[in-house]
């Protein structure tokens, strides 16, 4: 298997990114698809595209995908209430386990929304239970690498008319992170017109419509219990995972 990583930017600002794990005979075809994806992105034509092809020498981990649950909402305010409630339910268990004041959960979640609404990070922010930023670079963040969605699962997702290629990409990321010591993930798309976001926990991938306004930037935040940031980075970046 080979890892394909595509990153595209314009004037130093992130435009598009994607990860694939493919067989050797698929490299040319998938590389072309990734470049086309970068060149046709709604956020603009990039002036820089990086495509990295690297042989995977570690064993591939196959992980069953999180169950996809769609929450319909017509307003950002209502959608965010749904997201907050899902996050609070999950975070409360970890706050109690670590003897922390559960009244601080609202403040922690509010910090996460401020991060995603600010946008322009190339990767995800990581917050511990005290609200500290753990990522090594606050501009770059951390990228979840060496992932893909199994072809059968991709086809199944795309058969559902309400789901998209973005869902295929997101389910791989969400499934990997909650299996790598991340408590929960909050995400909105960096595509300006795509307003659906999600919350991921061990209970599922909660796809929430209208989690941001059209034209608004997006972002990604991981909530982590562990302070061993080097181990966390190693798992998220280097552990090869195919989600089925």
From Swiss-Prot:
Its EC number is 6.2.1.14. It holds the Pfam family BioW. It catalyses: heptanedioate + ATP + CoA = 6-carboxyhexanoyl-CoA + AMP + diphosphate. One of its GO terms (molecular function) is magnesium ion binding. One of its GO terms (biological process) is biotin biosynthetic process. Keywords: ATP-binding, Biotin biosynthesis, Ligase, Magnesium, Nucleotide-binding. Pathway: Metabolic intermediate metabolism; pimeloyl-CoA biosynthesis; pimeloyl-CoA from pimelate: step 1/1. It comes from the Archaea. Its cofactor is Mg(2+). Coiled coil: none annotated. Belongs to the BioW family. Catalyzes the transformation of pimelate into pimeloyl-CoA with concomitant hydrolysis of ATP to AMP. Homodimer. This is 6-carboxyhexanoate--CoA ligase.
């Amino acid at each position: 298997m080979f890892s394909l990583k595509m990153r595209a930017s314009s004037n130093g600002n992130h435009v598009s990114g994607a990860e694939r794990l493919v067989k050797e005979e698929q490299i040319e075809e998938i590389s072309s698809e990734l470049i086309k994806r970068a060149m046709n992105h709604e956020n603009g034509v990039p002036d820089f595209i990086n495509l990295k092809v690297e042989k995977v020498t570690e064993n591939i981990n196959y992980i069953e995908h999180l169950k996809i649950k769609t929450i319909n909402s017509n307003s950002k305010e209502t959608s965010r209430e749904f997201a907050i409630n899902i996050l609070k339910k999950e975070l409360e268990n970890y706050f109690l386990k670590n003897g922390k004041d559960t009244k601080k959960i609202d403040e922690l979640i509010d910090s996460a929304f401020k991060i995603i609404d600010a946008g322009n990070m190339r990767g995800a922010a990581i917050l511990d239970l005290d609200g500290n930023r753990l990522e090594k670079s606050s501009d770059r963040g951390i990228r979840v690498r060496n992932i893909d969605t199994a072809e059968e699962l991709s086809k199944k997702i795309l058969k559902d008319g309400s789901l998209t290629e973005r869902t295929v990409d997101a389910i791989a990321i969400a499934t990997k992170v909650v299996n790598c010591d991340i408590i929960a993930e909050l995400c909105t798309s960096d595509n300006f017109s795509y307003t659906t976001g999600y919350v991921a926990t061990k209970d599922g991938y909660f796809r929430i419509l209208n989690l941001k306004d059209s034209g608004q930037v997006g972002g990604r935040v991981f909530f982590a219990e562990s302070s061993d940031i080097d181990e966390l980075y190693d798992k998220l970046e280097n552990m090869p995972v195919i989600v089925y």
